[in-house]
Amino acid sequence: MITKKKIELLAPAGNLEILKVAVDSGADSVYLGLKEYSARAGADNFTLDELEEGVDYAHTRSAKVFLAVNTLMSDNEFELFYPTIAEAVNIGVDGLIVQDLAVLTKLASDFPDVTINCSTQMNIYGADEFKKLADLGANRVVLPRELSCDEIETRTKIALGYNLETEVFAHGAVCVCASGLCLFSAMNRSGTRSGNRGSCAQPCREEYQLYNNGLKLKDGHLLSPKDRDVSEYLARLIKSGVSSLKIEGRMRDANYVRSAVYCYRRMIDAYYEGKLDKDLIKEIRYDLLINFNRGGAFTTQYLSGSKDDHLLSGEYPGKYGVRIGRISRLEAGNGLVTVGIKNGAWWT
């Protein structure tokens, strides 16, 4: 039976430096990948020697380490990679994140003392799948980003009945397609970069043109979602029984991870101290926006269950910043920019 405890803050670690930054900034756990067979092949990732140093660093600071093995594998690939997974378990990783059901079954059987997490790449929407996963040896399900708060709460209650924890993405990038089901990347350009093999080309971040009967309706970054932020829903997610809040971003740099972890650590601690209010959420959300956002805002469309037009980032899919005012004058010769701030003051 799962004992109710303080919700876990799970942070990304694309390399050893970022692992240390995440732990020092307040993460309860980190997740990472080795050089092969993780869903973020573009990250630096870890050698076994780096993994050993990272596990030791985390454990001496009471943090856990989860190893992502969350791609689909052929039988031959798994046979070749299995000794590496066994070595990682011997080093002391606390859990394994998997996508492939055959991999899940084998690892749960061979390593019963290691937590097995079902990746969001498994695309577990139906609550009827929880019992099957529990019977195979899973300990936690990472729920799809596309669920509303009501759906998360319902599924969490059902999962707990099968002794399964649930994990929810709290912050970071949102895919335009359901995780684990997107074939868009494999169709793009070279035709070889599969999102289910760790090599997503992110074609949703590119520019497109929309036509109807030969008439161009619009163009731009039409498929690029804004990033996700659950700060205004954090209290509800905790009350629903979710076990872990996950920050996306194994390909983000150390500054991004430091800021995101610090902000969510503040909110989680404030909740348990009875101090999480609208003013604190507003302050922290502003800090998160400065850290990174697409389109000048975050999206909560899936969490709210609404069907508005605030999901996509708009004209620009990269780091957007925050609006501080309107540029009123440029003096190119001496590099002077005059900006009008909302409160009527002037900065030069």
List where the protein language model places each region.
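Surface-exposed amphipathic alpha-helical tracts and adjacent flexible/coil segments at the periphery
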Residues: 1-25, 29-39, 54-55, 61-71, ...
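Alpha-helix capping/helix-boundary segments
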Residues: 102-103
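Aromatic- and glycine-enriched glycan-recognition loops and surfaces
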Residues: 43-52
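Basic, amphipathic alpha-helical recognition segments used for DNA target recognition
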Residues: 106
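Conserved SAM-binding loop
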Residues: 11, 96-97
